[in-house]
Each structure stands twice: as C-alpha cells, then as structure tokens.
Amino acid sequence: MVKVVLLAGGGGHTGYAYSLAQHLSGKCELEAFYPQNDELSYKRLSKYADTKALVLPRGPKTGMGPFLKGLARSFLQSSKLLKGKYVIVSTGNNFCIPPSLISWTKSNPIVSLEASVRFVGPSKTANILKRFAKVIALHWEEQKKIFPQGEVFGPIIAEPAVKSHNDGYVLVTGGTYGHSGLLKSLDSLDLENVVVQSGPHNLEKLKEKHPTWNIFGWSDKFHEILAGADVVVTASGSTVLESAIVYKKPTIISYNPEWTRTAKYEDILMLSKKVNGILLETFNHNSLMDAIEKARKQKPPEIKSGAGKLSKRILELAEEL
C-alpha cells in the first residue's frame, strides 16, 4: 500500500491535515506528525493516522536562539523518524520545514499547502518549500498571483462533525495562541449566552463577571460547539472556513495586529470577503455588537471543499513512487 505523511503544525494547520486525513484514511498507509505536547492535534489525528510527535522549532514568541536549537532538533528527529518511500504534505508553519527537506533529500515528493488566508504574499514556509515541492496546493484562484505554478483545489475543509443547528449563543474564539485584544473587549459585552474559547489566556476574572458564560481553553469537541453557534467571532485561522462554509454560520473575523509573523491586514480583508464575513478591526463593546448584528444579515457562501480533490492528487503522486 502506498504511504502518505501529513505534517500538522497545530491549530489551523492541523485542521488542514485533519481534513485530508478524512479522505486519505483507508486508501493508503497514513502517518501524521504533530508538535510535541499538542494533545489536541494528537486526539484529532490519531482517529485516522499513525501519529508521531516532533519538536516545533518556533512559536509566536520564540527567540532566535531557542528557534535555532529547535530547528536542529527537528532535523535530527525527522531524519530518524521518516522511513521508506512516501508523499509528504506540508500544511504550513515552520514545523513542516525540517521533515519536508529531509524527505526531499530522500527523493520523496513534497506537497506544499499554502494557508487559506494568504492573498497578498506567501507565507514563509510555503515560500521556502516552493523550490522543493512537487505540488504547490492552493485554496483560491487569487493565490495564483503568489504562486503561478500552483494548483488550485478549493478550500481545504473537513466534513461536518455534526449537523449545523442554532443553540443561540455567540461563540468567540481566540485561536491557538489566543487574541488578547478581542478577549479583553468581551469584559463589557452585555450578552447572557456567550461561549468563549480562550486559548492559553486565563480568564478567571471574566468568568466571575459573566457567570452564565461557558469559557474554556481548548476542546477536541470544538466542532460540535461551532455547529451550535448563532454567530461566530474568530481569528483568521481555519475556523473562518469551517464556520462560514462548513456550518454556514454568520462569521466575524477579528484582525490581530500583534501577530506580526502571520497574515497582513489586506489578507484578512480579502478572506472576509471570500466568506461573506464581517471584518472586526477595533475591539470594544459597540464595535463588537455592531459586527454581530451585521453578520446576522450576511448570506453564507456556497463553496465546495477541495480536500477530496487534493487527496486524490496526493494519492496519484504516491502511486508513481
């Protein structure tokens, strides 16, 4: 049986890998690498693949010294863990660079997936891997301006975990690393039914002020929570696609100027237009309430997932080995 290795760098990157794993499972020998200590990625991917932990060289606040040490460790681990002939799939993030390059030295083809939020310029990982990748996979036609040699498959999104329904709550998610500006603005929000995914932030004071709210850090049942929301307020990761396209939720995308290593303002603006979402630029009670009302009036987009199409392309490459 042919072999495929998925690289899941956490958060939305794991979301892409999870979406592909749903289609690849049972059709190939499937391995998935995830960042050490990332229990959420492990729980999601272990349903479909043989999972292996690998060091994540750099997080949002990692300095250059620790980054270089982590990079060296990742190259060493990758050279020991990756064996045989296979297709390796990078879903973005610096996590994917060492195992991808080690695979290239072993003449194993790389599929490099660009992030769905990139419209103006490439991500660092995709830009590095473009010289080595057999296939550069894109979500949108507009991304051909960044990678003319890329292949467009459509947005890489998972099959719905449960049927979409409306339990009446506003879901606010700060993403994998949290969104301090957005989360601070919730303090004055005068709503009874709110669910908050806080990420690494401690929101004990917010819990005390809003005892009716459901506040949690992370959950492997997140998709069930997403499916029951009335409106979703989220960062610019893959939750945008899942909320607007998979579960047809009114979606608000919150721009985070603190994330200097991620997408630019123009990227977030274009993504919000693609999914008929509302872009949230300022974080206070009035702007948030106004965005919620505007989002409820938006019609969800009709866009097909590209996960099945990309999975088929990956298997075709594997058959050629």
Task: Report the location of each language-model feature.
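Nucleotide-activated sugar donor-binding and catalytic core shared by glycosyltransferases
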Residues: M1-L321
